[in-house]
């Protein structure tokens, strides 16, 4: 079993210590970004859309519960960019390069370092494992067992699986991209995003109720 240790922030950098047996790996966010940079634009975009979409429920809940810290307009902006991204990924619609870069930045580079903090906050409110909202939602809606395989005690565990199992990195990314392509064929972008919003609205009362207990 993989155990996640301490998390420290140095400026904007996120450094994670991952304990695997007696071996402690120092994980720097820059390493994650470097790996993502090695993908083609299309692969990075697909991977970013997939990760961002799974993050949306967490971010939506956090914006509603902590409006003094997080700007809900950022969520709406991300939703709009995500819609454009799905159109790009599914229909080969050409998007201006700067727009594509903004999609990738907002989906991965800006939000990913905050995901552990977000997941921890939501977990404290809901008294549930952080990923039950994100990957659990993906499994419930899509019956995709791979989402359960990614589950651990922190979001985007696949980044760390990729890091620890270097030889499987390309395969994991390829599987993630193929999974996302399949999801795009099953559910149109607007309907999928609305489903995520409905899911959050329906579960908001449960989260707030548990937080008061």
Regions inferred by a protein language model and the residue ranges of each:
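Structured binding/interaction patches within domain cores
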Residues: 21, 25-35, 39-175
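Glycine-rich, aromatic-bearing surface loops/beta-hairpins
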Residues: 146-213
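Intrinsically disordered, low-complexity segments enriched in serine/threonine/proline/glycine
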Residues: 7-16
């Amino acid at each position: 079993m993989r155990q996640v240790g301490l998390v420290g922030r140095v400026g904007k950098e996120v450094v994670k210590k991952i304990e695997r047996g007696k071996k402690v790996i120092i994980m720097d966010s820059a390493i994650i970004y470097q790996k993502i940079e090695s993908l083609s634009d299309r692969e990075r975009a697909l991977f970013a859309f997939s990760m961002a979409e799974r993050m949306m429920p967490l971010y939506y809940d956090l914006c509603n519960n902590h409006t003094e810290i997080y700007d809900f307009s950022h969520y709406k902006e991300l939703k709009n960019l995500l819609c454009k991204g799905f159109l790009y990924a599914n229909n080969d619609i050409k998007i201006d390069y700067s727009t594509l870069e903004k999609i990738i930045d907002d989906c991965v580079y800006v939000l990913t370092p905050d995901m552990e903090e977000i997941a921890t906050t939501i977990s404290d409110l809901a008294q549930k494992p952080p990923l039950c909202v994100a990957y659990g939602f993906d499994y419930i809606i899509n019956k995709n067992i791979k989402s359960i395989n990614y589950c651990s005690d922190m979001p985007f565990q696949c980044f760390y699986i990729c890091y620890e199992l270097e030889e499987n990195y390309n395969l994991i990314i390829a599987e993630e991209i193929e999974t996302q392509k399949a999801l795009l064929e099953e559910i149109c972008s607007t309907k999928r995003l609305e489903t995520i919003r409905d899911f959050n609205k329906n579960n908001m009362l449960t989260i707030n109720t548990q937080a008061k207990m």
